UniProtKB/Swiss-Prot annotation:
ATP binds at residues 30-33, 51, 87-91, 415, 479-481, 495. Its main location: cytoplasm. Belongs to the chaperonin (HSP60) family. The keyword Nucleotide-binding applies. It comes from Salmonella typhimurium (strain LT2 / SGSC1412 / ATCC 700720). GO terms for molecular function: ATP binding; ATP-dependent protein folding chaperone; isomerase activity; unfolded protein binding. This is Chaperonin GroEL. Transmembrane segments: none annotated.
Length: 548
């Protein structure tokens, strides 16, 4: 086992604080509408330019291992805030730095670290309750656009696009961000349910100009098996041909003579058919087939529940107003499924989201809800260069997370004002002893830090602005973009409550752990001294040369 380097008490805390400051100082220059950019070098390709706090934090590794431990712990604050609310990473870092700096000063002055932590936790718990009381629901498009604009660093077009997307697909709909092809940002909305499987044969195409298959009012056969024998399908095909409607087959696979016969029937015009593979794999495929069945009012033909394809009737088939299939995607528009059944299915998937443990599972389940409940919107980000595209895409994703958080828990006045108001409301909070009171004061002082940093990044004097804002009440604050005072809500400067709450809670959590740190252990650096064994042998040979 490698030897360890151990530091105790103040030595450990000073090193840790140095690491915290390096990371926090790099991150906090990005805060606010006049925050600066940070350029990140990449091992290949052009450097990345960003104003996203968590992107900056993730790049930082320090040479000194003790300092690096401090930096990594604050990086955790930014990552956690990002995971919880998708934004507020810089605010969380600024809060953490302030609590750690003031807290370690108090520890150095002889305060009890555990009581300090209890005081900080008490203040944060009270602040969270006050934040919830200040929160205003965010339901209309205007407020959503304002939140998106603020989070995208005052880019109004992004805010409007996100509001429009939410308007079209609903609050539950899936909104994805992709690279655009031009200079302008675009919004594409996919109505109905779309999944990423295309036609199994190009011979199904009936719209050569678009290279797509379009079926009007088709029957939809859903089978949880491979279909290779056409005999299994004859009863269904005959029934559909009599009804004079087209047929869409969604199965695990359609191959061999079954596919060949379907193609021949389609080309001869006997019955209009198209076949696609079912989306997903394994259990997820079964679940998605069931989703499609619910949406279209059909039944999944599955041998697991004793159903056979030969015995399927028209009653087992789903129906939709229209289906469009191209080489990569299938879109089912206006399924005839009952609204109550669809809502029941959505509620069931929501329950699974609550219980999901992995982010991947949660994301896939949310996509399924969206496909059943609303639709899918795609924001295509336009930019002149790849570097700008990366930076802008990151901003749009941030803004999207922020607007979702705003819809979830409401909004408070932005620009650091909400935390100032909360701090003034809990200013009389008292702990059980003097050390806890100091902890409460540390947390209250930290709540001013985001406003001060926003003002500092504007090139103004933080203390003057902070005192002026404290002197006002309600939503009165400082608009850093225009450098004027006024009602933040009226000026459209809003922060999602969830973002502010998460930033404060995660900052206090990690800061509390760091204040109560008494010892740090790391591996000793390996010495790079050369191995002298080989050199010694060579010396001996030289001696032998002298004897000859």
């Amino acid at each position: 086992m490698a030897a360890k380097d151990v530091k105790f008490g103040n030595d450990a805390r000073v090193k840790m604080l140095r690491g915290v400051n390096v990371l926090a100082d790099a991150v906090k220059v990005t805060l606010g509408p006049k925050g600066r950019n940070v350029v990140l070098d990449k091992s290949f390709g052009a450097p990345t330019i960003t104003k996203d706090g968590v992107s900056v934090a993730r790049e930082i590794e320090l040479e000194d291992k003790f300092e690096n431990m401090g930096a990594q712990m604050v990086k955790e604050v930014a990552s956690k805030a990002n995971d919880a609310a998708g934004d507020g990473t810089t605010t969380a870092t600024v809060l953490a730095q302030s609590i750690i700096t003031e807290g370690l000063k108090a520890v150095a002055a002889g305060m009890n670290p555990m009581d300090l932590k209890r005081g900080i936790d008490k203040a944060v718990a009270a602040a969270v309750e006050e934040l919830k009381a200040l929160s205003v629901p965010c339901s209309d498009s205007k407020a959503i656009a304002q939140v998106g604009t603020i989070s995208a660093n005052s880019d109004e077009t992004v805010g409007k696009l996100i509001a429009e997307a939410m308007d079209k697909v609903g609050k539950e709909g899936v909104i994805t961000v992709e690279d655009g092809t031009g200079l302008q940002d675009e919004l594409d909305v996919v109505e109905g349910m779309q999944f990423d499987r295309g036609y199994l044969s190009p011979y199904f195409i009936n719209k050569p100009e678009t290279g797509a298959v379009e079926l009007e009012s088709p029957f939809i056969l859903l089978a949880d098996k491979k279909i290779s024998n056409i005999r299994e399908m004859l009863p269904v095909l005959e029934a559909v041909a009599k009804a004079g409607k087209p047929l869409l087959i969604i199965a695990e696979d359609v191959e061999g003579e079954a596919l060949a016969t379907l193609v021949v029937n389609t080309m001869r015009g006997i019955v209009k058919v198209a076949a696609v593979k079912a989306p997903g794999f394994g259990d997820r495929r079964k679940a998605m087939l069931q989703d499609i069945a619910t949406l279209t009012g059909g039944t999944v033909i599955s041998e697991e529940i004793g159903m056979e394809l030969e015995k399927a009737t028209l009653e087992d088939l789903g129906q939709a107003k229209r289906v469009v299939i191209n080489k990569d995607t299938t879109t089912i528009i206006d399924g005839v499924g009952e609204e109550a059944a669809i809502q029941g299915r959505v509620a069931q998937i929501r329950q699974q989201i609550e219980e999901a443990t992995s982010d991947y599972d949660r994301e896939k389940l949310q996509e399924r809800v969206a496909k059943l409940a609303g639709g899918v919107a795609v924001i295509k980000v336009g930019a002149a260069t790849e570097v700008e595209m990366k930076e802008k895409k990151a901003r749009v994703e941030d803004a999207l997370h922020a607007t979702r958080a705003a819809v979830e828990e409401g909004v408070v006045a932005g620009g650091g004002v909400a935390l100032i108001r909360v701090a003034s409301k809990i200013a009389d909070l008292k702990g059980q002893n003097e050390d806890q009171n100091v902890g409460i004061k540390v947390a209250l002082r930290a709540m001013e830090a985001p406003l001060r940093q926003i003002v500092l990044n504007c090139g103004e004097e933080p203390s003057v602005v902070a005192n002026t804002v404290k002197g006002g009440d309600g939503n009165y604050g400082y608009n850093a973009a225009t450098e004027e005072y006024g009602n933040m809500i009226d000026m459209g400067i809003l922060d999602p409550t969830k973002v502010t709450r998460s930033a404060l809670q995660y900052a206090a959590s990690v800061a509390g752990l760091m204040i109560t740190t008494e010892c740090m252990v790391t591996d000793l650096p390996k010495s790079d001294a050369p191995d002298l064994g080989a050199a010694g042998g060579m010396g001996g040979m030289g001696g032998m040369g002298g004897m000859m």
